[in-house]
Amino acid sequence: MDGNAVSLFGLRNPIYNYNAGTDLGIRHFFNDQIELNLGYLVPSNNASNPFPQNGLFDGTYSSLAQIIFNLSDTSRFGLSYINSYSPSGGDDPDVEPNTELTPFGTSTGSNLSNSSFGSPVSVNAYGFSGTFRLSPGLAISGWAGYANHRYIARGDGSMWTWAASLNFPDLGKEGSVGGILVGMEPRLTQLDSNLGSPDRDTSLHLEAFYKYALTDNIQVTPAIIWLTAPDRNADNDDIIIGAIRTVFRF
């Protein structure tokens, strides 16, 4: 259920980003309405690495179970469960980093939500995603995600994220899409006291984009992104980002 936004956060539920790379997957259709996806993923730079805490089964991995309900031609939603494990990525200044390891996290959200606190991390993540087309020119979509981080031998933390968007298919030209998105990038809302304090403030991600189909093979997407309370700190000034993405298909 990936989207058309420019930012990584806007593309899909961040819980899918805990790991990515080399994967083995099974896709099964019970009928036209219900689909089951199972997957096992290992970062590409780890899969063929013979060193300890690497390879297919001795290092970073992520397993996925997802069920998708295609209610009609205009609506679908999915429920996801992800189990992930990451050896220590060395983001604790008191621990010597291991550069052979893939960093922990979703690559979006606050620094705390992507910190391993210098220990191996086991993650159990749960997600919901849905999209509903209200008319040929208007669709709404969104997701929510929760993850429990177990910092092995050190403590636990809880991460939350969500987003909602309006999409305008064929806006201005067939094949083009406009969109407006608002959401909360991954935020660590709970953290065991021996590890410190969780993120103190809520930060919002607002994004507007327009994917314009120049030709059947070339798409240009200008976008503007507004981040409030960067890194979950209301004392930080808001950030506004402009971006242009061009995609060539051959």
Each language-model region and where it sits:
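Sequence/structural signature of outer-membrane beta-barrel proteins
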Residues: 8-12, 41-54, 84-90, 109-115, ...
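Transmembrane beta-barrel strands of outer-membrane/channel proteins
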Residues: 38-42, 79-83, 142-146, 164, ...
